């Protein structure tokens, strides 16, 4: 079951990366009041937060996949860490992406709404973030 959890974590990471890229491209293209909205500091801060969360997720997913290759005894613990972190991050990035797109974020005109829906479904597959946080805590002795 842990290999499936690691695989869905990798898929979710890919979705989060693509949703982030779509959002950043939109911020660079969309103009409001004659100014690219990507120049607004509040949106830059939100994008920077998404970027840092994605970098953490990359490390978690790579570590979980490495555990399988190394046949480590830490597989369940590290996989739960990855699934919890990536689930929360995909949730965050899909929410932020739709917010930054405004009303068109949930229309068929832009794909960002599809990532929002996929994030919600993938988060529940093989245990949600809460399940994996609890599992991680149990496996580390808390």
For the regions a protein language model found, what residue spans apply to each?
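Alpha-helical interface subdomain recognition
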Residues: 2-142
């Amino acid at each position: 079951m842990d290999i499936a959890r690691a695989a869905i974590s990798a898929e979710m990471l890919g979705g989060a990366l693509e949703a982030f890229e779509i959002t950043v491209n939109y911020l660079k293209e969309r103009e409001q009041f004659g100014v690219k909205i990507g120049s607004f500091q509040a949106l830059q801060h939100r994008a920077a937060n998404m970027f840092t969360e994605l970098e953490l997720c990359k490390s978690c997913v790579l570590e979980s996949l490495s555990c399988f290759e190394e046949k480590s005894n830490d597989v369940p613990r590290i996989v739960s860490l990855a699934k919890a972190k990536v689930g929360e991050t995909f949730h965050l990035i899909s929410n932020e992406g739709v917010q930054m797109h405004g009303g068109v974020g949930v229309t068929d005109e832009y794909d960002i709404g599809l990532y929002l829906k996929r994030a919600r479904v993938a988060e529940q597959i093989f245990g949600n973030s809460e399940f994996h946080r609890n599992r991680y805590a149990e496996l580390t002795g808390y």
